[in-house]
């Protein structure tokens, strides 16, 4: 499983391998209660070695599977943005985090309305996810469960990596890039609340702190239930795909926002490759982002092609 998860190249290092390796390493190095020459240290060393080998094999396997497909999105984890934009990223971070958690409020909404109450609960939940991991880190010395300690460090490793990439890099292009922080925050919060529950003096606090997590889970379940079963059939991409299939047009080219979506919705019965429209005499060029160069050559058994101008 580790090898398969590491086939996604740079992204797998940033979001999967690095937190695990960093969590195990920090937990062992900072455990002053256990001597270096112990069974725990040997187990941790073997874990790091196995994960490192799995990471290497996974990246090799991923490179073999990808072939010539260009994965430009992965460069967002390894490049700096213009320093003049860094402060703008800092200012945008709190709102981006809230919007990622589902904040959707207008300036005309009342505090006592349903939308207002939801917004307030979302703000409290955001504070909960930001503060509880800090409290867990402060209580680190009292936590004896090695798994919880590894999880705490894994969270802070991925948080540090994502924040550097968001504030100083290219991750700020999409708020969904912050989702790894939300994921590890929830895991750390659950593990920490479980630790609190086993202590009699903090059991009531644990129950109270579980309320924000319960709200989020129930709210998300409600949102999923509200989604119509055939909602995807109302999208423009689905309608375009059905039209192309009816016209027996099975291979062509379109802009990024239509090409891959239609290909997936039509289960590759209609294959559309990405092209970029230009203002020069060429008119368009091959879009190599998440594409294979061979897709723009003559295809075996294909005698007609189309260009979607939508």
Regions found by a protein language model. Give the residues of each.
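Membrane-interface alpha helices of multi-pass inner-membrane proteins
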Residues: 1-10, 16-21
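Hydrophobic/aromatic-rich transmembrane helices and adjacent perimembrane loops
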Residues: 14-15, 116-129, 144-201
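Perimembrane helix-loop-helix junctions
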Residues: 14-49
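Membrane-interface helix-boundary motifs at transmembrane edges
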Residues: 29-42, 139-149, 195-206
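Membrane-lumen/periplasm interface segments of multi-pass, membrane-embedded glycan/lipid transferases
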Residues: 60-135
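Transmembrane alpha-helical segments
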Residues: 192-197, 206-232
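Short periplasmic/luminal acceptor-recognition loop of GT-C membrane glycosyltransferases, typified by
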Residues: 246-282
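Periplasmic/luminal catalytic loop of GT-C fold multi-pass membrane glycosyltransferases
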Residues: 287-310
């Amino acid at each position: 499983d580790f090898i398969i998860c590491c086939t996604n190249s740079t992204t797998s290092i940033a979001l999967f391998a690095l937190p695990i390796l960093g969590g195990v390493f920090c937990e062992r190095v900072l455990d002053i209660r256990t001597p270096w020459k112990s069974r725990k240290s040997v187990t941790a060393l073997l874990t790091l070695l196995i994960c490192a080998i799995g990471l290497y094999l996974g990246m090799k396997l991923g490179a073999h599977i990808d072939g010539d497909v260009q994965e430009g999105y992965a460069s967002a984890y390894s490049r700096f943005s213009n320093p003049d934009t860094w402060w703008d990223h800092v200012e945008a971070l709190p709102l981006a985090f809230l919007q990622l958690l589902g904040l959707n409020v207008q300036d005309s909404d009342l505090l006592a309305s349903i939308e207002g109450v939801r917004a307030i609960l979302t703000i409290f939940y955001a504070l909960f996810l930001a503060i509880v991991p800090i409290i867990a880190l402060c209580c680190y010395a009292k936590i004896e469960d090695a798994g919880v300690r590894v999880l705490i460090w894994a969270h802070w490793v991925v948080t540090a990596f994502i924040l550097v990439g968001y504030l100083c890099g290219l991750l700020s292009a999409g708020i969904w890039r912050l989702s790894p922080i939300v994921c590890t925050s929830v895991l750390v919060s659950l593990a920490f609340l479980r630790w609190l529950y086993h202590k009699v003096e903090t059991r009531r606090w644990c129950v109270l702190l579980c309320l924000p997590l319960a709200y989020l889970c129930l709210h998300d379940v409600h949102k999923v239930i509200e989604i119509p079963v055939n909602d995807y059939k109302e999208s423009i991409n689905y309608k375009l795909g059905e039209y192309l299939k009816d016209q027996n047009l099975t291979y062509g080219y379109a802009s990024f926002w239509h090409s891959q979506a239609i290909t997936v919705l039509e289960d590759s019965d209609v294959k559309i490759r990405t092209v970029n429209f230009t203002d020069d005499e060429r008119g368009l060029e091959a879009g190599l982002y998440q594409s294979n160069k061979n897709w723009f050559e003559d295809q075996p058994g294909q005698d007609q092609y189309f260009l979607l101008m939508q």
